[in-house]
Amino acid sequence: MVHMHITAWALGLILFFVAYSLYSAGRKGKGVHMGLRLMYIIIIVTGFMLYMSIVKTATGSMHMWYGMKMLAGILVIAGMEMVLVKMSKNKPTGAVWGLFIVALVAVLYLGLKLPLGWYVFK
C-alpha cells in the first residue's frame, strides 16, 4: 500500500505541474486538471488506508504524528487545487503557493521521519 500511495503522490505532483504550466501558458488544462482530481481520490483513499493500518499497531504518540501528517497531506491537496483554480481564473496565487509549499515540506519531513519512512532525519 505504501508503494501505491507514493506512486499516486508522484503522479499527482507531475500532473499538478503539467496543469500549472498549461494554465500559465494560456492554454486549456481542464483535462489534466480533471485527471489530477482523480489522483486526489486515490491519494486520499490510500493515505487513509495506511493511517488505519497504523492505528492498529502504533503505540504512544504515533497516532498523533500520523494524524498530523494526514492533515498536512489534505492541506497539500487543497493547496494544489486552489493554485490551479486561481490560475484558471487569472487571480493572484502567492498566498496559496505559500500554503502549498509549507504543507508539502511538513508532509515530506513527517513522511521521512516517521517509522514507515526512510529514516533520513534520525
UniProtKB/Swiss-Prot annotation:
Name listed for the protein in its UniProt record: UPF0344 protein BcerKBAB4_1054
Source taxon at top rank: Bacteria
Topology versus the membrane: Multi-pass membrane protein
Residue ranges of the TM segments: 6-26, 38-58, 65-85, 92-112
NCBIfam families: PRK13673.1-1
Intracellular or extracellular location(s): Cell membrane
Gene Ontology CC annotations of this record: plasma membrane
Organism of derivation: Bacillus mycoides (strain KBAB4) (Bacillus weihenstephanensis)
Family to which this protein belongs: Belongs to the UPF0344 family.
Xref: Pfam families: DUF1516
This protein's UniProt keywords: Cell membrane, Membrane, Transmembrane, Transmembrane helix
